[in-house]
């Protein structure tokens, strides 16, 4: 038996079991129920354990004061899509995603449309997560009758990525910022224009995506071409070293030397097919 802490709506309740707070979602589970009552939870009910840290718990409880439970249902459907696409979801994003969608819809109603400067890079680095976010767009529209734009889809992509990796949304945004500012400076210094849709650029973004996975799994590339690229492509090597230092700073991890060599090779390919402005 679970003790009801709060009835959010007919289909969603917050319960306590063995000193653990859990959001339970099942059709009609909250109908006619009151705080303090005990309730049986169906075996097929969706359950989301609340974060245990004090700060996270306080934020979670505050969310219930202002957010329509409908947004928790939206978030739950998106998590289901994520599980279907990627398997197990490593981190619970139920409330953080619901909170983001709530404010996204609020901004739409207020005609406030913040831009996402990392939209294209997010699509290139996380195409699978982005495909789930596109489906999430339809779920949001089904519930709210509001259509989110491409920039918001990219933001939701980062939430989905954080659910299947150890990278939090803020950290992923920092990685995107570092990459964007690095190429902005490189283009200005060399008076060139880099095509973000080129195959070479897409390959670089894909390499960085798997670089992050290798870091998270404490894995290293088997072949080290660092000395080769240092001798063959000294300028690209030096630029790759700068990028590695910047990424290490935001990730709080040192990048192996083997990553430097491959980043240099990708940068050389990009630079070899750039257009002088």
Positions of PLM-derived features:
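A cross-family "folded-core" feature that marks the main globular domain of proteins
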Residues: 1-277
């Amino acid at each position: 038996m679970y003790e009801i802490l709060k009835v959010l709506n007919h289909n969603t309740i917050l319960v306590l079991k063995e000193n653990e707070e859990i959001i339970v979602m099942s059709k009609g589970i909250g109908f006619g129920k009151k705080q303090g009552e005990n309730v049986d939870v169906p075996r097929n009910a969706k359950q989301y354990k609340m974060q245990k840290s004090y700060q996270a718990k306080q934020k979670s409880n505050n969310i219930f004061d202002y957010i329509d439970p409908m947004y928790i249902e939206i978030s739950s459907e998106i998590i289901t899509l994520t599980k279907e696409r990627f398997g197990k979801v490593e981190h619970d994003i139920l409330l953080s995603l619901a909170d983001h969608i709530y404010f996204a819809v609020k901004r739409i109603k207020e005609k406030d449309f913040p831009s996402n400067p990392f939209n294209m890079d997010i699509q290139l680095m996380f195409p699978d997560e982005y495909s789930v976010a596109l489906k999430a767009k339809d779920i949001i529209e089904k519930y709210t009758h509001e259509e989110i734009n491409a920039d918001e889809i990219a933001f939701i992509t980062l939430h989905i990525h954080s659910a299947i990796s150890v990278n939090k949304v803020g950290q992923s945004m920092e990685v995107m910022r570092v990459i964007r500012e690095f190429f902005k400076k490189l283009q200005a210094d060399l008076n060139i224009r880099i095509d973000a849709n080129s195959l070479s650029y897409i390959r670089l973004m894909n390499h960085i995506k798997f670089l992050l996975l290798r870091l998270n799994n404490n894995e290293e590339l088997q072949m080290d071409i660092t000395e080769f690229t240092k001798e063959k492509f000294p300028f690209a090597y030096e630029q790759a070293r700068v990028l590695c230092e910047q990424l290490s700073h935001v990730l709080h991890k040192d990048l192996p030397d083997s990553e430097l060599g491959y980043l240099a090779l990708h940068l050389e390919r990009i630079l070899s097919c750039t257009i002088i402005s």
